[in-house]
């Protein structure tokens, strides 16, 4: 049993010699190296498998504490440093560089996209700056372009090529200049329209205010005219009332004028009526009768009926008002309306006037 165990132990201890056997085939490595370098069909993703010792953990000397002693090859060189130092081969270096280049591209596509955008933006910005410098036109070029824009807002391609060749410009420069000029023209027209609209609106407001002022002035003039007419009317009524009062006082004092009245039988009732109303009317009538009798011819049979034409006087409105004031005692109390006469006084006036006219015609 012990012998068998020792044999097994010896077999186990002899396992590292297998690795030494594997590393003792340099022609295989040389052929693989030469083929990988010469063969251009190998992709970058192909990875050379690690050594056989790393794939099998039982063969790995680091996993066994018993294999602490260094292993020596027949040539006297240690195989482990050779296996753990792959950068010695140039094709390994190429593979690592390719892996480093591919891993960031595969792991961060977003970062690569951003970097590409940045790289694209940078030349664009630099190109934009250079383009802005190229937009400096000479006075002659601007003059010719303005003339052409005055006649044609849009250019056809043949004309654009012709102008570009004439002014020593590129076709793109001419096209961009016309685009910018059209936008400028549009802004100018819009500003003018806005200003005109504001001016029209202000003019409308001013016209509306003037119309309102005219209407107000006309209304005020009408009010002033009406008030003036009312004031004149009130003044006229006040003067007429004062005159009527003064004349009424004169009648009461006996200073009244004589009026030609014919003493006809048809007017006797009216005379009696007035005699009963006021005593002053009797004096007036007696004086009028005396004047009429003095002016008549005594020999004529119509001496008591026909008055003389010299003493004939037409009744005026003031005399009528005087008589009405003397006849009716109610009129002095109501002096606001001087034309407010009684029915009896109107009958008296109409009868006297008609009789006088008839007598004049008969005479």
Curated annotation (Swiss-Prot):
Record keywords: Developmental protein, DNA-binding, Homeobox, Nucleus, Transcription, Transcription regulation
Stored InterPro entries: HD, HD_metazoa, Homeobox_Antennapedia_CS, Homeobox_CS, Homeodomain-like_sf
Compositional bias of kind Polar residues: 31-46, 55-78
Location of the protein in the cell: Nucleus
GO (cellular component) term, any one: nucleus
UniProt key word Disulfide bond: no
CDD domains tied to this protein: homeodomain
PANTHER family: HOMEOBOX PROTEIN HOX-A2, PROTEIN ZERKNUELLT 1-RELATED
This protein's name: Homeobox protein Hox-A2
């Amino acid at each position: 049993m012990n012998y068998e165990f020792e044999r097994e132990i010896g077999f186990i201890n002899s396992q590292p010699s297998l690795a030494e056997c594997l590393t003792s085939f340099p022609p295989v490595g040389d052929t693989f190296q030469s083929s990988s370098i010469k063969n251009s069909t190998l992709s970058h993703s192909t990875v050379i498998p690690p050594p056989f010792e790393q794939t099998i953990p039982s063969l790995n000397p680091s996993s066994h504490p018993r294999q602490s002693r260094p292993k020596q090859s027949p040539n006297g060189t240690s195989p482990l440093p050779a296996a753990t130092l792959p950068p010695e081969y140039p094709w390994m270096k190429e593979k690592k560089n390719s892996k480093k280049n591919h891993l960031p591209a595969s792991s961060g596509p977003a970062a690569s996209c951003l970097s590409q955008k940045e790289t694209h933006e940078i030349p664009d910005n630099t190109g934009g700056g250079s383009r802005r410098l190229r937009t400096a036109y000479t006075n002659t070029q601007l003059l010719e372009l303005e003339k052409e824009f005055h006649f044609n807002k849009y250019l056809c391609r043949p004309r654009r090529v012709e102008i570009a060749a004439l002014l020593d410009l590129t076709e793109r420069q001419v096209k961009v200049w016309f685009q910018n000029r059209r936008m400028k023209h549009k802004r100018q027209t819009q500003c003018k329209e806005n200003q005109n609209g504001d001016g029209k609106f202000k003019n409308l407001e001013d016209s509306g205010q003037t119309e309102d002022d005219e209407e107000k002035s006309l209304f005020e003039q009408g009010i002033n005219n009406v008030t003036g007419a009312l004031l004149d009317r009130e003044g006229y009524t006040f003067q007429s009332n004062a005159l009527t009062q003064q004349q009424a006082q004169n009648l009461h004092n006996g200073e009244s004028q004589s009026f030609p009245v014919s003493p006809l039988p048809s007017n006797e009732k009216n005379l009696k009526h007035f005699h009963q109303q006021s005593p002053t009317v009797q004096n007036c009538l007696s004086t009028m009768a005396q004047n009429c009798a003095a002016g008549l011819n005594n020999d004529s049979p119509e001496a008591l009926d026909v008055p003389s034409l010299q003493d004939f006087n037409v009744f005026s409105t003031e005399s009528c008002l005087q008589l009405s004031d003397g006849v009716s005692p109610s009129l002095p109390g109501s002096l606001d309306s001087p034309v407010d006469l009684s029915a009896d006084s109107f009958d008296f006036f109409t009868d006297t006037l008609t009789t006088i006219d008839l007598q004049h015609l008969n005479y």
